[in-house]
Amino acid sequence: RSLESTLQATFPGIRFSFYGINGAWARRFYEHDMISRVAAENPDLLVISFGTNEAHGSALDRQAHAKTMDLLTQRIRERCPDVCFLFTTPPGSYLSQRVYRTTRGRRRRTTVKVVNPNTPDVANSIVRYCQERQMAVWDLYTIAGGEQSACTNWRDAGLMNTDLVHFLTTGYTLQGTLLGEAICKAYEEAALPGTQTRMMHGSTPLEQKPYKSVAGF
């Protein structure tokens, strides 16, 4: 809700809808009746936030990942031809890993948390996909510190849940506020009409008019 309140503070009267499904992968949405729900709303801007669950699968297949995003955006655009897409990258997360440790001469197996090595691949795949198609992307992973420090920054700030995958309310609130501020900033800096931007990755401007409705996955 922090994204909604941040946008409404700048653009009063904007309508915001949220279609999140906890634990869902991107392909869940184009196989689901979610496309019909989005079409019924007919949003001006659709924020697509995937990546954390994809990063917890096996090694990323970049071609399959791009195909999934293509199918999703194509099926939405068939129903909403004027919609603008804004992708976001995942914030970063940890994996549980079994290791052996020797204590008092006895070898024991224990579980430790390690930074998820798949997140950079997923984030880079999303950024590359948007660059190639001139779609907007907000690179939260890089903003948070990237491969070197995104995960530790979130954890050390006390914003992550104990599973080190999900976030506390304060963490999600911060992410929503940052995204809302980025959208407002991109609009304020817009210079040319009718173009989508790679937010935080270049100066290509957004469409120079306020959005009336925003939807988010």
Question: Model regions: which residues?
Answer:
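Conserved SGNH/GDSL esterase-like catalytic core that processes O-acyl groups on lipids
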Residues: R1-L71, E78, Y94-S96, H166, ...
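Extracytoplasmic/secreted proteins, especially bacterial periplasmic and envelope-associated proteins
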Residues: S2, D33, L60, A64-R75, ...
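Sec-exported extracytoplasmic/periplasmic mature domains
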Residues: Q8, A39, G51, Q74-P81, ...
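Active-site proximal loops enriched in glycine and acidic residues that flank catalytic Cys/His/Asp
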Residues: G20-G23, S49-T52, F87-G92, D139-T142, ...
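Conserved, well-ordered alpha-helix/loop/beta-strand core segments that scaffold catalytic motifs
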Residues: V47-G51, T73, C84-T89, N124
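Extended hydrophobic-aromatic, low-complexity segments
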Residues: G57-S58, C84-T88, S96-V99, Q148-S149
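Catalytic His-Asp segment of secreted/periplasmic serine-dependent ester chemistry enzymes
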Residues: S93-F217
